[in-house]
């Protein structure tokens, strides 16, 4: 007879399984908030999170932190036997114990107590869950991660590179031999850490060391991780080899019957290809066109494969990027989008069939980011892919994901003060990269949309990205340290955040952010200095702004002499020089500024010599060419001439020079300059024609709108007002205030002009960032509202005053290169 005293563990209720799984799923992502239904499990998961907070992406916790965490760990160990809630759940007990002893092993390692560390790690390794029937798939994933984490620290504890590598090569594939889901971030993290410690040159070496075949997709994946960690491009020689392996897998695969699933080997190989094609896309490396046939065959041999559709999305975009045939380029891009649509459709189906649970939420977010970065409104496909709707769905999904996993999220109001409200979020590396990329993608798509700027959505996107990108240089020896890719990415996010604050006219906060976050650690970040100077220029005393500009110009000149000035910094150099001229004009007068003008042309010739064609353009658009930049300089000169007496001909000549720089491209700035010159010359009809031409192509063009408004509401100053203006601005060399004005046929004609101007200005403040923050626009709106006897004129006048007081010397866009 069976022993009646043997206690049979009860079946775990499904509700308990669900909440435990959700807690483990959140922890694998790097989450910090858990409600598993077991206080002991929540406590040990929280302990593990706090330990990882000081371990992941850093050199480990400081000794005081180690001491605190070690004491808590030891208290948990003592209380294990008294945790009655675990009595009926042996699988949870073993999980808690395993996590705890891993934590103890890590803490002892970082305290330098290597023998004690090894004892705890070996104890954790011996803990086996014999109640396999009660283990869920999530528990098995979590157990696999714990074993790999344990393996990594057992390798480190040996303190011998050869022993460590032998341990890794001997054991890793015994525990994990398939590429894990991207959402299993902690397993990803430790696989990456192990790979970073391995020494090998070729894929064949790696396979031999692991005693497996080189065709193994997991081996190829490990090799790809190593390539991600290295700036070298040796992997490019393996493209044909990968294709050969893929074709071998295809030969063995067949389309599944109704009772079968897709071929595992083919799907696994496609998972590897996702990383490979993403890597080649990032590095702008062309792949073999024969991959096209491979991916088509993969589709033919699978049924609604999530993995194949995502692989195809990456591949077709790569083929599009590298095609010289415009028709093929568009066709491949369309194929990439269609495969994204399939990827989403298959994921949604999985979600519905699995109790509203995503197959791999991080992979899902990653696919959205990729397709939105590589497409635009013009790529929309009727009834299939609507770009704007896809962006909205992505934003909603991202916020829902954060809510579901209780991840820290900075709100719109909090995002206005990063220095006060920021927190450091530490997630596994692959999770951080995907989420940072997601928030950055939303910012890049919506950064020109006024409603998202005013609602503080843009600052929120950037803050949530910055919370994930916390890798910075130490303050010590700042200049000697070489900046890595992560530091550069964070610095760029910080600049965009400061720039967005300045756009919103939160000038003081922008100044604090620039000085505290960026310039204290990156003294040679020129565009941040330029933005700081523009922010400082709103102050009545322009001396601080002027000093900043002069100092940075000296530093940039030194970099130029040392031949270390990058192309975008050369553009910055020119615009910084123009900002200097604007400040000189404001402080000392226009004539003084005109004396400095020749220096700009000399600088341009030095920065962009004809003998260096690589400096001709920053990108494919005409507005990114050095010719366009030269036109901007001539237009700047023309505007300056217009502000002086008897220099109409010089202004006209400067505009002509700008037009002659490039005859193939029509620069609307030349029309705008001609319009203002025509106002000065009392030629309102010519001026109107020029402004109307610009508004036809760009209905929200600020300069054209203001010029049009000037024609309808000309400013005429009396003698006393003119003398007073000259006294306060030190502009004795400026023209009289009389301006040209339009002649109306009758009152109906005049009313129609007012109505048109009202319509244009009201549309502009709803759509254009520059127009919304322009004091001139609000001034002319107040005049119109006053004529219409609309009380809104008071509010418009207040906004005019507010934005005039916060108006920089030049547009902020001139520092953003």
Swiss-Prot record:
It is a peripheral membrane protein. GO terms for cellular component: actin cortical patch; cytoplasm; cytosol; endosome; nucleus; plasma membrane. It comes from the Eukaryota. Its main location: cytoplasm. It is found in: Cytoplasmic granule; Cell membrane. Keywords: Cell membrane, Endocytosis, Membrane. The keyword Transmembrane helix does not apply. InterPro entries: Endocytosis_PI4K-reg_protein, TPR-like_helical_dom_sf. GO terms for biological process: protein localization to plasma membrane; protein targeting to vacuole; receptor-mediated endocytosis. Belongs to the YPP1 family. Interacts with ribosomes. Present with 1640 molecules/cell in log phase SD medium. Involved in endocytosis. This is Cargo-transport protein YPP1. The lineage of its organism: Eukaryota, Fungi, Dikarya, Ascomycota, Saccharomycotina.
